[in-house]
Amino acid sequence: MTATTTAQPSGPVPPASPTAARRLLLVHAHPDDEVITTGATMAAYAAEGAHVTLVTCTAGEEGEVLVPELAHLAADREDRLAEIRVVELANAMTALGVADHRFLGGVGCYRDSGMMGTPANDKPHAFWRADLDEAAAHLVKVVREIRPQVLVTYDENGGYGHPDHIQAHRVAMRAAELAADPAFAPEHGAVWDVAKIYWTAMPESVLAEGIQALKEAGDTSGFIAVESVEDLSFGTDDALVTTTIDGTAYMENKREGMRAYPTQISMGQGFFALSNSIGMEFMAHEFYQLVKGAAEGSDTGLEKDLFAGLGIADGTAAGVSQG
């Protein structure tokens, strides 16, 4: 995958009324977040015939640029990185087999806020500064159109404390609440109550195994190996993890999706790194914490299906429409 591409950034036009029995909505902060934490999940459900919708809240304008010949596009220079990241996202969606992708409020409605405490937090249209209900209203339109039984977003800390991730969490949770409220914006469509809500998770035990694997791998082309989980800004207590999706059959889709982001992700043999150069192991399994709905465990104690317990194998909808 090279840094230049001819893919069209607008992406395919999403269907107005999905007819798939299973409908999954994911809300992420920036292009590349979706493939790193949920790529195998998205590919798996898309391949199985579920309607998968991705809503990305910003175009990642403040991201660092790992491709030297594109460094001039960075926010502190020409400020045109969004042009590339939108195209990278379109290519990643092709790799994952996902046709329905939207930007919250449309491309450019909200800007990447940068890391916490930086001047980018206060730029015009920074997502971190967005009015919560106004931003949530954009997502309510999507929820009532798609009628997802399952919603995936981040935990209260946004996974690792990035302001856009925290805001994505707030907007997603507020939108789920408002979409079920008959008094809120009836012009946005019939009321819909999402049956199950998950937050992405990375069990501390799995992180520890990945750190050890990187150490044992030796030279990994400049990737930094941290000493312990405590050195990372993220990680979920294993006791909070309720669900795991086995993405083994879709790892190549996930890898190809990650290769679609040359400006953001450095790829290695079995490992990858972002701009901080900290090596992370490719994960065949992706993990979640169920925060709304009832978990349906297995002999391992973890759910194996985001739609478990919803009774939609026969094609009946499990969400609640009140319109």
From Swiss-Prot:
This is 1D-myo-inositol 2-acetamido-2-deoxy-alpha-D-glucopyranoside deacetylase 1. InterPro entries: GlcNAc_PI_deacetylase-related (IPR003737), LmbE-like_dom_sf (IPR024078), Mycothiol_biosynthesis_MshB (IPR017810). It comes from Catenulispora acidiphila (strain DSM 44928 / JCM 14897 / NBRC 102108 / NRRL B-24433 / ID139908). Disulfide bonds: none annotated. SUPFAM superfamilies: LmbE-like. The gene is mshB1. It catalyses: 1D-myo-inositol 2-acetamido-2-deoxy-alpha-D-glucopyranoside + H2O = 1D-myo-inositol 2-amino-2-deoxy-alpha-D-glucopyranoside + acetate. GO terms for biological process: mycothiol biosynthetic process. Belongs to the MshB deacetylase family. Keywords: Hydrolase, Metal-binding, Zinc.
